């Protein structure tokens, strides 16, 4: 992978994907299983302009059939567009980000975005925000652009030595730059990290920016009508075990206490190139040192 200014110029390498910080921070908490298709078709969601129903996805959901997702009633999708690696600090695009934005948009699902940060300075956080704004500029980003940062207490994290105040400054720098670039900023974290300013100075962040809280009740929505997080929040991720038509893997499911009548215009006038899904998104590759011997003679040539 060639790196320019700490930004990886390729979107898919085994080395870089192995250093994906989200890969090591999934499954810390497990939510209740939810069949989203059954939930929405049953008419259990409040029909209100102030409450909307969505999912958040990354390459870990594989190739998504967005027409089926749309038919299930999902109204919005928060799509991971990239991450900064936890060891080398490279910014890397999620290998299915453009495909997911393209297809969700084409099927009438309103889209937002999120970025998985491992920034260690406010300058790096601003760099991440600018990278995100440039990357999504050709798409109709109606929902917020969120900052996601986890695993910072792991000894192998490049953020391990940061103080809570430094992490918060870094998050605010990202969110402020996203706002300056014309998008709605939002901060994502788990309930136990935000409550009482436990791991973040939430009281500082919530004064200006939307909060997206992750909190998984044992009995999911709609039986549990709302999160028990008592802080201000605009979006609630209530399980990571959702079942949605068109998605082969469990998916995070969200309730937003806001919606949009229309769809935002893309910031760029350039039409995005049509892309295909990353066929290798769910494949695991291992290094081997084996000798392969052909059973039959094979003639290789470089012309027909």
Predicted segments, located by residue:
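SH3-family beta-barrel domains
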Residues: 268-299
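Hydrophobic anchor at the start of a short beta-strand
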Residues: 111, 184-186, 211
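Aromatic-lined carbohydrate-recognition surfaces of secreted/lumenal glycan-active proteins
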Residues: 178-196
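Substrate-binding cleft of extracellular glycoside hydrolase catalytic domains
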Residues: 47-175, 179-181
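Functionally critical loop-and-helix segments that line ligand-binding/catalytic clefts
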Residues: 2-61, 204-279
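Distinct, well-ordered alpha-helical segments
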Residues: 125-133, 194-204
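Short alpha-helix capping/helix-loop boundary micro-motifs
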Residues: 302-304
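Gram-positive cell-envelope targeting signals
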Residues: 1-2, 178
